[in-house]
From Swiss-Prot:
It catalyses: tRNA(Asp) + L-aspartate + ATP = L-aspartyl-tRNA(Asp) + AMP + diphosphate. ATP binds at residues 214-216, 223, 457, 505-508. The gene is aspS. L-aspartate binds at residues 168, 214, 423, 464. It is found in: Cytoplasm. This is Aspartate--tRNA ligase. It is an enzyme of class 6 (ligase). It comes from Mycoplasma pneumoniae (strain ATCC 29342 / M129 / Subtype 1).
Length: 557
């Protein structure tokens, strides 16, 4: 590095940090050329860094003669007022620091680039001011969480990322281990086991901003690699954990976003949430609760008669004084079909029913019917969730938290035709079910609690099992050999405290805060919808030599 560069770097000011104190003084900035405009003898160069953009007004055309978009420049000149709000730099010396090829996308807040192009050239996409703001906001939220938990007496502990593959949950990402023949590490789906062992070890208050890995299909709110705010505490009840998490979010939202959250967060039982909203993660920013409309079709022959006579149910959502256009109804009908039901509607203007309905309110009623209430209510819940986009029911910066409790301990897997753990097999049964939970799988409840924000599950937690006898019974009831978790069972025999915890999705939280529709928008280098990292093309094939030498002394047969 030459001395001139070193001097410039020390003098450099971020564009966003320029204030009236710099007026009429010589300032130095560094950034990328965004646009070049010519007006008579004047040349206007718009230069931007991660904080803002500024106009550089130049009379010397030789200085801008060879500049193009995204060239990296260092500008030194006088700071002047452009108007009552903005500044400009005049009489500049412009130094070309690094030449840029023609960029494959428009590097502005609004870009017409397809997502695949943005991900392929993510380093360019990250220059967009909106992306830099998202990264900065993520940093502030993470820092606020760390500081708050530190004040509450938590310590941050890093747990292993090369660990043991265990049953339950999604598929593991496996890593071959050279040190032991035909053996694999697994990347953790959660720090679950280690944080429980930390409680046995006397840590009492643990947290970690943890990277976790799940080999599952990507969705708008899922990635194979993501980050969670993970914590665990000893000698806490469910209510104490819920109060702790509520206070954490109230403080973080106040400090980072200057938003005062309503408290206490509403608490809904799992069954209540499903009956009212058709979901265990309801969006409480608007109403439109689900209703049993079977009685409306009891007295006269109609298209639901046979189903009702066979014990089926008709469910509905009333939209007082609201009407859906054809495009919206078509989209909702497809959503219903994807959920295994048909969607009908009736309003005082139009109807897909074969007979009129006597409704007390003007507006629209959406209807589905099915022999199974679970199927009908699940479909209606999905429709209700989609309505907010078609009817503009919510406003930006509107946040509605709620807790869901009294979850089932088990759920029946229709595909596998067996009972599985509804959350994870370390969740404690509620006290009234401790004696015989394995004999009442359809009724037994767990001490699980989920935090929901704006219709997304933000995090899930529970009181953990700390009694080795209860843990053995639960595992055996799921067909899991307790010896697969012998290291946990052994630890429980050395005075394990009552403990509880939670994992909160940081990426999902930032998606909601930034009001974007998928978590790829708030991650620096996400995978695409197919799980591919576009710039490096990972996952990729490796040299066969690298594979064969892993177990060279013990080749795979």
């Amino acid at each position: 590095m030459n001395l001139d560069n070193a001097k410039c770097f020390k003098q450099r000011v971020f564009i966003g940090n320029l204030t009236s104190e710099h007026l009429n003084k010589t300032v130095t900035i560094a950034g990328w050329v965004k646009r070049i405009k010519k007006l008579g003898e004047l040349n206007f160069v718009i230069v931007g860094d991660k904080t803002n953009t500024i106009q550089v007004t130049c009379k010397n055309k030789e200085q801008v003669k060879y500049l193009t978009r995204e060239d990296l420049v260092i500008v030194k000149g006088k700071l002047k007022r452009l108007d009552s709000v903005r500044f400009e730099i005049t009489n500049p010396t412009i130094t070309l620091f690094a030449k840029s090829k023609t960029p494959p996308l428009i590097i502005e807040d609004k870009t017409d680039a397809l997502e695949e192009v943005r991900l392929r050239y993510r380093y360019l996409d990250l220059r967009r001011p909106v992306m830099q703001k998202r990264l900065a906001l993520r940093h502030k939220v993470t820092l606020a969480v760390r500081n708050w938990l530190d004040q509450m007496g938590f310590i941050e502990v890093e747990t292993p990322t090369l660990t043991k593959s265990t049953p339950e949950g999604a598929r593991d990402f496996l890593v071959p281990a050279r040190i032991r023949e035909h053996s694999f590490y697994a990347l953790p789906q959660s720090p679950q086991i280690y944080k429980q062992l930390l409680m046995v070890g006397g840590t009492e208050k643990y947290f970690q901003i943890a990277h976790v890995y799940r080999d599952e299909d990507s969705r708008k709110d899922r990635q194979p690699e993501h980050t969670q705010i993970d914590l665990e505490v000893a000698f806490y009840t469910k209510e104490m954990v819920m109060d702790l998490i509520q206070r954490l979010f109230v403080d973080v939202f106040r400090q980072v976003l200057n938003i005062k959250l309503k408290k206490p967060f509403p608490v809904l039982k799992f069954a209540e949430a499903f009956n009212r909203f058709g979901s265990d993660k309801p969006d409480l920013r608007y109403g439109f609760e689900l209703e049993d409309c079977t009685d409306l079709f009891q007295d006269s022959p109609n298209q639901f008669t046979n189903l009702i006579n066979a014990g089926g149910i008709v469910g509905g959502i009333q939209l007082p004084n609201l009407y859906l256009d054809e495009v919206s109804f078509k989209a909702l009908r497809k959503l219903a079909k994807d959920n295994g039901v048909s969607l009908e509607f009736y309003s005082d203007k139009a109807s897909s029913l074969k007979q009129p309905l006597d409704l007390p309110l003007a507006g629209t009623i959406l209807l589905v019917a099915h022999k199974s209430k679970t199927q009908a209510w699940t479909a209606l819940g999905a429709i209700r969730n989609e309505l907010k986009y078609h009817l503009n029911l919510v406003k930006p910066n509107q946040y509605s938290f709620c807790w869901i409790v009294d979850f089932p301990l088990y759920e029946f897997d229709e595909k596998e035709q067996k009972w599985v753990s509804a959350h994870n097999m370390f969740s404690n049964p509620q006290p009234q079910w401790l004696v015989n939970f394995e004999n009442h799988k359809a009724e037994a409840l767990s001490e699980q609690y989920d935090l929901v924000l704006n219709g997304f599950e933000l995090g899930s937690g529970s009181i953990r099992i700390h009694d080795p006898e209860v843990q053995t019974r639960l595992m055996q009831s799921l067909g899991v050999d307790p010896q697969q978790f012998g290291f946990v069972m052994e630890a429980y025999q050395y005075g394990a405290p009552v403990h509880a915890g939670m994992g909160l999705g940081l990426d999902r939280l930032m998606m909601i805060i930034n009001n974007v529709d998928n978590i790829r928008e708030v991650m620096a280098f996400p995978k695409n919808a197919q799980g591919i990292e576009m710039h490096t093309n990972a996952p990729d094939q490796v040299d066969i030599k690298d594979i064969t030498t892993i177990w060279s002394k013990h080749p795979v047969k």
